[in-house]
Regions:
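Short acidic capping loops at alpha-helix termini that bridge into adjacent secondary structure
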Residues: 2-5, 32-34
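Extended hydrophobic blocks
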Residues: 23-34, 38-145
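Active-site-proximal alpha-helix that buttresses catalytic centers in soluble enzyme cores
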Residues: 16-23
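Short beta->alpha junction loops
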Residues: 5-15
Length: 145
C-alpha cells in the first residue's frame, strides 16, 4: 500500500537521474531498500550501474518503459511494429544503443571506475563487444561520443 511517491524531474542525464534521486530521498529522510527504475530501455544497464556506484545495498528493480524489436526490411534496419508513443526514429535508436557500449565498457574512455568514474563496474560480455565492433563498420556515424 503506497501512501507517498516521489519523482525526480530536474535531471538532464543518467548520472544526475541517480544523484538527484538519491538527494531527494535524503531530503525526505527516506532510507530506500528498493528502487524501481523506469527508464528508456537503451539506458537501463547504465542507470542501474549508476545506483550501484552510490549504494550497492539498494535492490534495483529495472523496468523498461517499452519493448521493441528491430528487424531487417528491404536491406535496412527498422522496427517490427512501432506503435510506441514518442519512440525514437530508427537512426536515433541505433545511435543510443551504439553509444551505450563504450559508456558501459570499464576502460579509460568508459564510464566505469577505470574511466570517468560515473558508474559501478559493468562486465560487458565478449560477444556484445564483438558485435559492437562489427556494427561500428556499418554504423560508425551513429556511435555517440
Amino acid at each position: 500500500n503506497i501512501k507517498d511517491y516521489y519523482i525526480e524531474r530536474e535531471s538532464t542525464n543518467c548520472g544526475n537521474n541517480v544523484t538527484y534521486a538519491l538527494r531527494l530521498l535524503n531530503e525526505k529522510n527516506i532510507e530506500a531498500k528498493n528502487i524501481i527504475i523506469i527508464q528508456d530501455t537503451t539506458m537501463q544497464h547504465r542507470m542501474e550501474a549508476g545506483f550501484r556506484k552510490y549504494d550497492s545495498n539498494i535492490n534495483i528493480i529495472n523496468y523498461a518503459s517499452y519493448k521493441t524489436k528491430v528487424i531487417v526490411k528491404e536491406d535496412k534496419l527498422t522496427f517490427e511494429k512501432n506503435n510506441i508513443l514518442g519512440m525514437w526514429d530508427i537512426e536515433r535508436y541505433i545511435s543510443l544503443l551504439m553509444g551505450e557500449i563504450p559508456r558501459l565498457n570499464d576502460n579509460e574512455s568508459g564510464y566505469g571506475p577505470n574511466g570517468r568514474g560515473y558508474i559501478a563496474h559493468v562486465e560487458v560480455p565478449k560477444d556484445v563487444l564483438d558485435a559492437f565492433e562489427y556494427l561500428k563498420g556499418e554504423y560508425r556515424n551513429l556511435v555517440r561520443a
